[in-house]
């Protein structure tokens, strides 16, 4: 679907193997570790699937598939406040406040909105880019109006701030979104 990239991995038995039994050119993961949930590779539907568009490495076909199947999917990524960091269809979806580590299990982050926005622009999806830019500007505008400051991340469905009032950092990327909407020069981020 243009969203996932996989690598074949082999898991060895729990016991450490003899060095002679290792196969050349084979990648062994977690040698000697017990098989538990947290040591297994999982395919999760997370926002970083859009990164190939931002990086410019997605083919036009992959980009089209991502936009159609993932960006436009309001049950998965496209929320009223922006892009969810994890699809709510995943079991670990959770928007509770968490500061250590910060919650990347569903809330909307401005840097994520921005990177997806830039990918959309790069591949010519201007209508979708405009939609995401407008959502992001509205989200931060409401936050500043209500609280006099910006927050680190937000609830996807209603835009309520979650944690860290006064957070600026990548929230300022919204200025590039506003400049793009106004057809002004956008500052190069890298």
Residue map of PLM features:
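An acidic- and aromatic-residue-enriched active-site/binding cleft used to recognize and process polar
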Residues: 9-10, 125, 134
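Amphipathic alpha-helical segments of tetratricopeptide repeats
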Residues: 137-138
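Beta-rich accessory regions
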Residues: 121-131, 182-190
């Amino acid at each position: 679907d243009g969203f996932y990239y996989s690598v074949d991995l082999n898991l060895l038995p729990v016991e450490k193997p003899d060095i002679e039994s290792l196969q050349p050119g084979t990648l062994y993961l977690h040698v000697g570790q017990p098989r538990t949930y947290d040591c297994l590779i999982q395919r999760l539907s997370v926002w970083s699937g859009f990164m190939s568009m931002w990086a410019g490495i997605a083919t036009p076909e992959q980009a089209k598939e991502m936009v159609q199947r993932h960006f436009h999917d309001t049950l998965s990524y496209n929320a009223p406040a922006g892009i969810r960091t994890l699809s709510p269809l995943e079991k670990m979806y959770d928007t509770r406040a968490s500061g250590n580590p910060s919650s990347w299990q569903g809330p909307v982050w401005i840097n994520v909105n921005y990177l997806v926005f830039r990918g959309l622009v790069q591949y010519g999806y201007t209508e979708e880019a405009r939609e995401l830019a407008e959502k992001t500007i509205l989200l931060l505008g409401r936050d500043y109006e209500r609280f006099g400051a910006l927050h680190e991340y937000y609830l996807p469905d209603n835009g309520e701030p979650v944690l860290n009032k006064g957070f600026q950092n990548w929230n300022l990327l919204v200025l590039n979104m506003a400049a793009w909407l106004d057809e002004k020069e956008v500052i190069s981020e890298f």
